[in-house]
Amino acid sequence: MAASTDIAGLEESFRKFAIHGDPKASGQEMNGKNWAKLCKDCKVADGKAVTGTDVDIVFSKVKAKSARVINYEEFKKALEELATKRFKGKTKEEAFDAICQLIAGKEPANIGVTKAKTGGAVDRLTDTSKYTGSHKERFDESGKGKGIAGRQDILDDSGYVSAYKNAGTYDAKVKK
């Protein structure tokens, strides 16, 4: 088997990939998407000896029949199956050690994640102080939205007769 430092690094990598993309995940179980990401990011799936399909098949083999996730023990079984396929010329133990070294200490890569742009047009379009017309009514001085009060004129239905609307506004209309 792999050295104890490799096993600790392997378990740490398992936990990091298990919680990737899921804020509610505990890190004890990994889903198929994160398993495929681990194999791709750690170069276990090279596209030649081990493909994405092989990764998915091994995941299905090691998980329980009705389960959608694997735990750490099933993860190690899956790695053993992939190790013999990835490193064909080596013994089972050497192949497992080699695959553990590929994964140990790694964490999910965020390559291809879109960053927020800050260009001239974006600044101009998102600066609420530069809005004109009815759009500037939708935000207060700090730039925070007013909600429905900024989008609609809300009618005051507080008259003492059903047809009398906007109570208290007569004096403003008729100037003395």
From Swiss-Prot:
List cellular component terms (GO). microtubule; microtubule bundle; perinuclear region of cytoplasm
**What compartments host this protein?**
Cytoplasm; Cytoplasm, Cytoskeleton
Keyword Cytoplasm found: yes
Q: Which Pfam families match?
A: p25-alpha
Q: What is its main location?
A: cytoplasm
Residues with PTM N-acetylalanine: 2
Say what the protein does. Answer: Regulator of microtubule dynamic that has microtubule bundling activity. Required for embryo implantation; possibly by regulating beta-catenin. Also required for decidualization via regulation of beta-catenin.
Family that this chain belongs to: Belongs to the TPPP family.
Q: What is this protein called?
A: Tubulin polymerization-promoting protein family member 3
**Gene source species:** Rattus norvegicus (Rat)
